[in-house]
């Protein structure tokens, strides 16, 4: 069975397992039915009638909420070897998000376009996740 960073809505955050492999954060979910549509494995999406974009959007927002609630060990990005005190409101973390699928690790980057502007607590771009202090 494939593992994914997408969550079923009924799956509570404490059922989520985060682990780091080669610098990538892996989020496992044994329950998700929409993940197969995301990686194109040819399996059914579980009979859901929602459009693919809607399922991707819902899944990405769910994974963001799960990551924001989880305690993830990451190293802050320092400039010139010292903390950047000018940006005390936010800290930048270099995080590589990815899915774990049947064919191995699938980079998360192709799905960033599915995030709406202005997430609740963070701004996500291709290379970093900015968390509030």
Swiss-Prot record:
Alphabetized InterPro entries for the sequence: Uncharacterised_Ycf68 (IPR022546)
Q: Does the keyword Plastid apply?
A: yes
Sorted UniProt keywords: Chloroplast, Plastid
Broad class of the protein's primary localization:
plastid
Q: Does the keyword Plastid apply?
A: yes
Looking at the Swiss-Prot or TrEMBL record, what is one Pfam family this protein matches? DUF2647
Q: Where in the cell is it found?
A: Plastid, Chloroplast
Write down the superkingdom of origin: Eukaryota
Could you state one GO cellular component term attached to this entry? chloroplast
In the record, the note on similarity to other proteins reads: Belongs to the ycf68 family.
Under which name does UniProt file this protein? Uncharacterized protein ycf68
Query: What organism does this protein naturally occur in?
Result: Oryza sativa subsp. indica (Rice)
Q: Which gene encodes it?
A: ycf68-1
């Amino acid at each position: 069975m494939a593992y994914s960073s997408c969550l079923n809505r009924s799956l509570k955050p404490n059922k989520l397992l985060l682990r780091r492999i080669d610098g990538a954060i892996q989020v496992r979910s044994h329950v998700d039915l929409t993940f197969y549509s995301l990686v194109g494995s040819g399996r059914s999406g579980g009979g859901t009638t929602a459009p693919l974009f809607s399922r991707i959007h819902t899944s990405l927002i769910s994974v963001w909420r799960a990551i924001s609630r989880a305690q993830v060990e990451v190293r802050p990005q320092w400039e010139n070897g010292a903390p950047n005190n000018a940006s005390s409101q936010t800290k930048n973390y270099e995080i590589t998000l990815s899915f774990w699928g049947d064919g191995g690790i699938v980079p998360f980057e192709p799905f960033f376009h599915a995030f709406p502007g202005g997430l609740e607590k963070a701004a996500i771009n291709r290379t970093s996740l900015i968390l509030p202090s």
